[in-house]
Amino acid sequence: MGSSEAETPAKANKASAPQEQQPPATSSTATPTVYPDWTSFQGYPPIPPHGFFPSPVVSNPQGHPYMWGPQPMMPPYGSPPYVIYPPGGIYAHPSMRPGAHPFAPYTMTSPNGNPDAAGTTTTAATAGGETNGKSSEGKEKSPIKRSKGSLGSLNMITGKNCVEHGKTSGASANGTISQSGESGSESSSEGSEANSQNDSQHKESGQEQDGDVRSSQNGVSPSPSQAQLKQTLAIMQMPSSGPVPGPTTNLNIGMDYWANTASSSPALHGKVTPTAIPGAVAPTEPWMQDERELKRQKRKQSNRDSARRSRLRKQAECEELAQRAEVLKQENASLKDEVSRIRKEYDELLSKNSSLKDNVGDKQHKTDEAGLDNKLQHSGDDSQKDTN
């Protein structure tokens, strides 16, 4: 009877505890009625929310420039300042996890739990954090199990240990006490010491099993396979089953324009053999190598074309000079013929001049002799007349 009288004020206190928490809840529900339209109290122009974090809710055109909603550190029964902060529906938490966006400031983790190319994040650390969190959670739940340590053989016979454990854990999370906890406290006074010792040993083994099940449900197992997640795996390129879809290159590319020599040279396919090097980045893509090879071949072909153009230009100049030399030779030969002809004519003129000079000299001598004879005859006639 004494135990039943002691339990009645405890039940009254437990029943009055939820009633004491009711007035703040009513005050929180009544505060939004003071300012029905919080957008009318905004002193900022209508600015749409930032586009980098997509929200599943359609953005309000009268959105507040601040990016955060009601702070989670505030008590749920308090009256949040609706004049300053907008409702949580407008600027909700981003729907994507940190690091999912390629241009996010967070690092992106690889699917196998290893760091990316930057090498800053691993899932092993998060797994360790989860194990620490679960261990602390187990420590917090241990007083609840110890409070149930006085249960007698009733739990061992009926098998209600796990059921009551789930009910008490749910009740502790909700801040209330269930009926099963009360029945456990009532039955605790009726258990014997021997049964309580056996029950404590059973709960210790159950706690270890519960910890193992909880760790297995969270994906953290103490097996040695966990060490494989911390090993850095090389990023390798998977070889394709079919041919590489990149363009095939040729060493004599562009030469088929001048000569059909493309069929004599083998074609190069852009396949890269995957090499497993720890901590190395992926090798260059085949199309990048093909592009470099194409650029190299184009540069070589342009050099060949420029050399060929220079040879053709020099050959054309040589041919032109040869033609001009032939023309000049023909002109020289014609000039030589003309000079020889003129020399012959000069010789003929000289011979004619000499013959004419001879003829003129003979005629002058004859005339001189004839005149002398005439003078002699006149002088003889004059002498004869004088003598007579």
From Swiss-Prot:
Entries under SMART domains matching the protein: BRLZ
Per UniProt, the ranges with Polar residues bias are: 169-179, 214-231
Q: Which residues form the bZIP domain?
A: 293-356
Decide whether keyword Transcription is in the record: yes
Q: Which Pfam families match?
A: bZIP_1, MFMR, MFMR_assoc
Annotated Low complexity bias: 23-33, 117-129, 180-193
What is any one GO biological process for this UniProt entry? defense response
Tell me, in one coarse class, where this protein mainly resides: nucleus
Q: Which GO terms describe its cellular component?
A: nucleus
Compositionally skewed regions (Basic and acidic residues) per UniProt: 302-316, 359-369, 375-388
Q: Which family does it belong to?
A: Belongs to the bZIP family.
Q: What job does this protein perform?
A: Probable transcription factor that may be involved in responses to fungal pathogen infection and abiotic stresses.
User: Can you say what this protein is called?
Assistant: bZIP transcription factor 1-D
The top of its lineage is: Eukaryota, Viridiplantae, Streptophyta, Embryophyta, Tracheophyta
The primary gene name is BZIP1-D
